[in-house]
Design a protein with these regions (language model features):
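Metallocofactor- and cofactor-centric catalytic cores in central/energy metabolism, strongly enriched
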Residues: 16, 39
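Short catalytic helix/loop segments, enriched in acidic residues and glycine
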Residues: 23-33
Length: 163
């Protein structure tokens, strides 16, 4: 099994500061990750603007293409760009573009064990659009071993690239 390093500083930190990071800070972190040899940098969420008010959150809650490109350009580097998309909080059919039109390389789909069906629909949609995908099973410590096994079995039968 090949291991890759994913930096989720922005996405995780955004939970504390409502995703209000300056472009200079984000550029600095991007450059630091490049120098450190990080494989993937997760910028934030692809959250639905129908569910979340842009006036209450910084731009990294939504990771619009123009905001990403303002920091990374065309990202002509070996580091891949990732975003997280939560089941039920992303309008993935609208918010996730075709890969050919995006600087994003991987969509990390976050779901609770009982949401694996919808998560697999998101995986399929993202794969059809040309993205790498990963599934993040949330709050897994609240699940029984059987629930975890079922969720992992579902993911293993999907087109997801990683868990």
């Amino acid at each position: 099994m090949e291991q890759k390093i994913l930096d989720c500083t922005l996405r995780d930190g955004g939970l504390v500061n409502r995703f209000y990071f300056t472009d200079d800070f984000v550029r600095g972190l991007y450059q630091a990750n490049l120098q450190a040899g990080i494989d993937y940098m997760e910028f934030g969420y692809k959250a639905s603007e129908a569910l979340f008010d842009r006036r209450e959150f910084g731009k990294w809650k939504f990771c619009r293409e123009e905001d990403l490109r303002a920091v990374v350009g065309d990202n002509k580097t070996s580091m891949k760009i990732s975003v997280m998309a939560d089941v039920g909080r992303t309008d993935y059919s609208k918010d996730i573009l075709e890969k050919k039109d995006s600087v994003i390389d991987m969509v990390r789909i976050a779901a609770y064990a009982e949401q694996m069906g919808e998560a697999m629909e998101m995986v399929s949609c993202c794969k059809e659009r040309g993205y790498e995908t990963s599934v993040n099973i949330m709050a897994i410590s609240n699940n029984t071993d059987e629930e975890i096994d079922r969720a992992l079995e579902t993911v293993s039968k999907s087109r997801a690239d990683a868990v």
